[in-house]
Design a protein with these regions (language model features):
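Non-heme Fe(II) oxygenase metal-center motifs and adjacent flexible, charged/small-residue loops
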Residues: 1-308
């Protein structure tokens, strides 16, 4: 028997992005788990060309966000703090990560697994993310106040994890996460830089099966409801490097992934907040403060797999 959230936190399927966005006819359902109230859908860009942006603009976003654009400047007054190397349990990973809060009053850093991701402060980087956010919000419907970014070089992916941090209170309320894939490969083929996105249940129940979808340049994807509570996701080949990156079509290029979320529980000075206090935490209601229990600090042990 799957334990669901309190009835007060239930929501209806007609509130899903795939049902409410201006492009709802083009969304392809991937996970539709009514028992767990967990849903995921994909909006393939190649089936709705120029509907919400263009390939030229997608290419421009990839170039503008690429880590090579934010290497340390020779001018000490130029702030290029954007991407940071990813690590797990003291071991370096292939990915680079970035974290942007979209509300100018929000000072929340992003803590997950054993990582504490500082906010990107580079004005140029933040402006680019904000510009992309406006396009994605127009295409999908929801309004977001934070964006997490991952850069995957050739051969790299990310291990099994759930985006289940306290910032969005995913154990007590439905959460909507929208992601955009920006890809670049050694050629201009359809799979250039594409990645396999894999999904599995956190706890197996009869009838469960894994999901696998190829995310290409410009594809949008949603994870909604209590997806982060009940499901894990990863990007092939996990946290290790592909043994044959040049001949594996799903890791032969680079990928930048942006995932938008909504912070509902800002850092409040608690141990889980590492003592940090966001000014917006003062606006949180007493009910939300007492309702959420602290997550364990130790990550789920998935072998050498990383969180995020």
């Amino acid at each position: 028997m799957v334990k669901l959230a309190d009835p007060a936190t239930k929501f209806t399927k007609d509130s899903l992005v795939s049902e409410t966005s201006p492009l709802k006819e083009s969304w392809v359902p991937l996970v539709s788990d009514d028992e767990r109230q967990s849903y995921a859908s994909v909006l393939p860009f190649d089936t709705h060309k120029a509907s919400w942006t263009t390939y030229t603009q997608l290419d421009g976003w990839f170039d503008a966000l690429h880590p090579s654009q934010f290497e340390k400047s020779t001018h000490s007054t130029v702030d290029k703090t954007a991407w940071t190397p990813a690590s797990y349990r003291g071991q370096p990973l292939w990915r680079q990560t970035a974290w942007v809060t979209l509300d100018p009053n929000c000072e929340c850093d992003y803590g997950y697994s054993d990582t504490w991701q500082k906010r990107a402060t580079c004005p140029t980087f933040r402006r680019i993310v904000q510009d992309i956010t406006e396009y994605v919000q127009d295409a999908t419907g929801p309004t977001f106040n934070a964006c997490n970014l991952n850069y995957y070089p050739t051969g790299a992916g990310i291990g099994w994890h759930a985006d289940d941090e306290t910032l969005w209170d995913p154990f007590h309320r439905p959460v909507t996460i929208v992601s955009l894939s920006l890809c670049r490969g050694p050629d201009d083929g359809l799979l250039a830089g594409a990645r396999r996105f894999m999904i599995r249940c956190q706890e197996y129940h009869p009838g469960d099966h894994p999901y696998d979808v190829v995310l290409k340049h410009g594809d949008l994807m949603t994870m909604e409801g209590f997806f982060q509570k009940h499901y894990l996701h990863s990007v092939w080949p996990g946290d290790g490097m592909s043994p044959d990156p040049l001949n594996d079509p799903f890791v032969s290029g680079e990928r930048i992934n942006l995932t938008w979320r909504t912070i509902v529980r800002h850092l409040d000075g608690s141990p889980a907040s590492r003592g940090q206090v966001c000014p917006l935490s003062k606006l949180q209601t007493d009910e939300s403060q007492t309702k959420t229990t602290e997550k364990p600090t130790d990550p789920v042990d998935n072998g050498d797999e990383d969180k995020r």
